[in-house]
Regions:
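ER/Golgi luminal nucleotide-sugar-dependent glycosyltransferases, focusing on the catalytic module
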Residues: 1-277
Length: 277
């Protein structure tokens, strides 16, 4: 499993995507380069697929040259951005990037397994993802119990678990102005979708449509959707330890653990060069 490629998903320009605090494009590029350099310097992954879904132009050859300096390979992909991301949320866009990368990438196409990391972040204890051979290996965390025992909210959660149901709930909120607290999701568990390892065929069979049910405005995230789908299948290796995360969250705009100054300075220089004409 240590030979599998790492897919990094990136969005430099989030447009009108809701619930994203870090919106400045130059800052996003900087933090993405911090995460990329950390993976190049400190991980076992020798092949990295860097996939982004926005129109910001960069000098992609610099990514390949930077990886080569570490004896590693980077494949750069540009995935078309769906307009539904602005309506359904960042988890929808994330799913579109992963699906597009699996369809277009030469490195991912050759590999039976792949690892995935959200851009801007680095997982220090990523060896936990490679510890055993499962069809999927994920971090699991409990969500606050927000009334799941109610028959009404059990029905609402069932609706969130289908594509048709999730669209109906979103339309009820957006068009009919049904109050949020009547139709919001109340998940009991989440999958930490920032980092996971998955068998390619397993992902395509079980998780490739999970993002289509995401409704961030109603509290039904990609994390909840993944958990609901993985509950129905076998072959999942759950990790209940805390992930040791470095980098800046685009959602919260906060830094979990900062990178060392030397890496941050190199990332700053790389980001400026990437964006230069």
């Amino acid at each position: 499993l240590s030979l599998l490629p790492l897919l990094i998903t990136a969005a430099f320009d989030v447009g009108e995507t809701p619930h994203v605090k870090l919106r400045d494009t130059r800052q996003r590029v900087l933090h993405h380069m911090e995460g990329l350099l950390a993976w190049l310097e400190s991980s076992v992954f020798r092949q990295i697929v860097f996939a982004k879904n926005c129109g910001i132009k960069i000098q992609e050859r610099l990514l390949c040259e930077t990886a080569a300096a570490f004896g590693k390979e980077v494949e750069f992909l540009e995935i078309p951005c769906s307009k539904l991301t602005a309506r359904q949320g960042k988890g929808f866009g994330e799913g579109e990037i992963v699906g597009g990368a699996l369809e277009r990438s030469g490195l991912l196409g050759k590999a039976p397994y792949f690892a995935k990391s959200t851009g801007k972040l680095f997982l220090k204890n990523h060896e936990l993802l490679l510890a055993d051979k499962w069809r999927a290996r994920c971090f699991r965390c409990a969500a606050p119990n927000r009334g799941n025992s109610s028959s009404w909210y059990r029905l609402v959660n069932k609706l969130h678990q289908s594509e048709v149901g999730s669209r109906c709930l979103a339309d009820m909120h957006r068009l009919l102005r049904v109050p949020w607290f009547f139709i919001c999701a109340r998940p009991q568990c989440w999958v930490d979708t920032r980092f996971y390892v998955c068998e390619r065929d397993f992902y395509l069979s079980n998780l490739s449509r999970s993002h289509r049910r995401v409704q961030d405005r109603l509290g039904y995230s990609l994390e909840a959707s993944f958990y609901d789908d993985l509950q129905r299948v076998e072959g999942v290796g759950w990790i209940d330890e805390m992930p040791l995360v470095y980098g800046t969250s685009g959602t919260l705009g906060t830094t979990a653990a900062p990178f060392v100054d030397a890496l941050r300075h190199r990332a700053q220089a790389l980001a400026e060069e990437l964006l230069s004409p």
